[in-house]
Amino acid sequence: MMIKRWKYFSEDELRCKGTGEIKMNEEFMTKLIELREKLNQPMIITSGYRSEEHNNSIGGSYKSAHIRGLAVDVGCSGAKAYNIVKLAMELGFQGIGINQHGPHEKRFIHLDTMTSEVIGVSRPWIWSYK
C-alpha cells in the first residue's frame, strides 16, 4: 500500500501505535497542514490514526475521530497551545480537546474535523480533559 507523505508530519507521528497503520483522511490532513502553516512553528503529533483495537486498549471513546483518521493530538503547552486553539477555531475544526494539566511534556491539544452527523452530538465542540 502506498502511504501518502504529508508536508510537516512524519509517518511515525501519524501511524497507529498498536498496528502501525496510517489511515489519515486527506481533507483532515489538508486542514491540519493549513493550521501548521498559519502557526509557522513545528507541531509534534503525539497521537494520529488509531485502529479500533488500539483505541479500545487505551480507553479511547468508541466514537473517537482518531479511528476515522479525522483527529490528531498535538503535544504543546502555554502560548503555543493557545495559538493552536485560536487557529483551529478560525479554520473550522469541529472538535478541540484541551489537556493542559500536569507536566508540560504530557500536555496536548486534540483537533478533529468530525461532524455532528458522524458522531451524533452537536458540533463544533470544545472540551477539557480531567
Regions found by a protein language model. Give the residues of each.
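Compositionally biased, low-complexity repeat tracts
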Residues: 14-16, 44, 55, 65, ...
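Generic alpha-helical scaffold signal
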Residues: 22-29, 48, 52, 68, ...
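Amphipathic alpha-helical interface surfaces
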Residues: 28-31, 41, 54, 70, ...
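Extracytoplasmic cell-surface/polysaccharide-interacting catalytic and binding patches
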Residues: 1-38, 115, 126-130
